[in-house]
Every structure is written in C-alpha cells, then in structure tokens.
C-alpha cells in the first residue's frame, strides 16, 4: 500500500474505476503520483462479492485512511465506468474524512465508433 510520510500539500485526486466486476480506487497527488490504491479484490473479496457496492465502500475507506495518515485533507473525484458502486465509493471517501471538492465523470462515450459485439447491439 502506501508509505507513511507527511505530505507538504493537502489536496489530491481520487480516481474511481467502476467496472461491472470490480471497483478500483486510486488516490494521487495533484501531479498524478499515486499515494495509495485499493480495490474490492485487494481487500479480500473474490468472485461475485467484488461487484457489490459494499465491497467498493470498504476499499474506498481503506485507501482513504492511508492518505489521511499522510496528511491529505481534500480530493477531487474522477469517476470512470458504469459500475453499480460509483456512488458508494464517493460516499465512503467522505465518510472516511476526506472532503470532496469536485466530482467529475470521465467515462469515455463513443460518438458512433467501433461496432459493439453481438450482445450489446
């Protein structure tokens, strides 16, 4: 996970990558250097339990506690993906003690790009 060191800044960026099978939370400083990360799988959940919003919340709390110890106080959240656990992860970051200053959805949307496989058509 993260090294225990005091930071000279208090703002950061939280990246939440929510897929249909897992949720990955990465906390970085403003330059993009990763400070801490956690996922539903790294917390210890396997199989279908990784997709639950509860496991995403636990992962977000674990990642947030590591950076709060370093001195991070507020984050800007970038959410990517259409998974069910996006909102829970944001609420868990707030509940862990991080102030959320901005929420930005960075999910890529095709403007009639590649043809999808058989199922989504």
Curated annotation (Swiss-Prot):
Gene3D superfamilies: Ribosomal protein S11. Coiled coil: none annotated. GO terms for cellular component: ribonucleoprotein complex; ribosome. GO terms for molecular function: rRNA binding; structural constituent of ribosome. It holds the Pfam family Ribosomal_S11. GO terms for biological process: translation. Keywords: Ribonucleoprotein, Ribosomal protein, RNA-binding, rRNA-binding. Belongs to the universal ribosomal protein uS11 family. Part of the 30S ribosomal subunit. Interacts with proteins S7 and S18. Binds to IF-3. Located on the platform of the 30S subunit, it bridges several disparate RNA helices of the 16S rRNA. Forms part of the Shine-Dalgarno cleft in the 70S ribosome. This is Small ribosomal subunit protein uS11. It comes from Ureaplasma parvum serovar 3 (strain ATCC 700970). The gene is rpsK.
């Amino acid at each position: 996970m993260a090294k225990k060191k005091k930071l000279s800044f208090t703002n950061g960026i939280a990246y939440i990558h929510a897929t249909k099978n897992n949720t990955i939370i990465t906390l970085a400083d403003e330059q993009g250097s990763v400070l801490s990360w956690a996922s539903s799988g790294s917390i210890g959940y396997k199989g279908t339990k990784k997709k639950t919003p509860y496991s995403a919340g636990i992962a977000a709390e674990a990642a947030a506690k590591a950076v709060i110890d370093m001195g991070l106080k507020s984050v800007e959240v970038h959410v990517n993906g259409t998974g069910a656990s996006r909102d829970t992860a944001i609420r868990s970051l707030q509940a862990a003690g991080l102030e959320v200053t901005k929420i930005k959805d960075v999910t890529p949307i095709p403007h009639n790009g590649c043809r999808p496989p058989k199922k989504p058509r």
